[in-house]
């Protein structure tokens, strides 16, 4: 279950970053050298594994940018910034809320396949139930401050630390 959640999260992230890499640099609208517009899907679904019920998401503001950098050891670092806001709805009961998930954040993909995420500002956090219990965090939340997560190549979260606050436990707020 934990691996599935991490793999889904990594898949979404890599899909988003892959889409950004194919976007024209001209769309960066003056962000500077190397920044590309980060196109997010208009809608998305948060699977029931995280909260026990499905959540439908809609991107309300999509004005994010990504920059890819290759480091000396062959790792790839992706810097992400901008403004992103979403609406989240539990279709079973109609509860809806909006969230600012603008970040910024940094993702480092190492040559061995492991990944480190460093987020600051406002961001989504998705954790499978076992990982949520292990780290004492909600399965799906918005937090503010620095959150660092290390993930092994097999999808196992090897460490997670937060120097910040959970702003909204989205599972509780939408249940």
Regions found by a protein language model. Give the residues of each.
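Bacterial N-terminal signal peptides
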Residues: 8-20
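C-terminal region of N-terminal signal peptides and the immediate post-cleavage residues
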Residues: 17-35
């Amino acid at each position: 279950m934990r691996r599935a959640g991490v793999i889904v999260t990594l898949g979404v992230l890599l899909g988003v970053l892959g889409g950004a890499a194919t976007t024209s640099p001209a769309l960066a609208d003056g962000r500077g050298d190397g920044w590309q517009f980060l196109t997010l899907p208009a809608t998305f679904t948060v699977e029931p594994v995280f909260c026990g019920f499905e959540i439908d998401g809609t991107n309300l503001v999509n004005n994010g940018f990504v920059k890819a950098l290759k480091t000396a050891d062959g790792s790839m670092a992706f810097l992400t910034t901008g403004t992103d806001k979403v609406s989240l709805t539990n279709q079973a009961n109609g509860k809806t809320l909006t969230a600012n998930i603008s970040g910024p954040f940094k993702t480092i993909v190492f040559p061995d396949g492991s990944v480190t995420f460093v987020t600051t500002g406002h961001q989504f956090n998705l954790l499978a139930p076992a990982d949520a219990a292990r780290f004492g965090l909600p399965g799906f939340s918005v937090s503010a401050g620095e959150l660092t997560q290390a993930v092994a190549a097999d999808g196992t979260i090897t460490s997670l630390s937060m120097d910040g606050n959970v702003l909204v436990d989205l599972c509780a707020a939408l249940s």
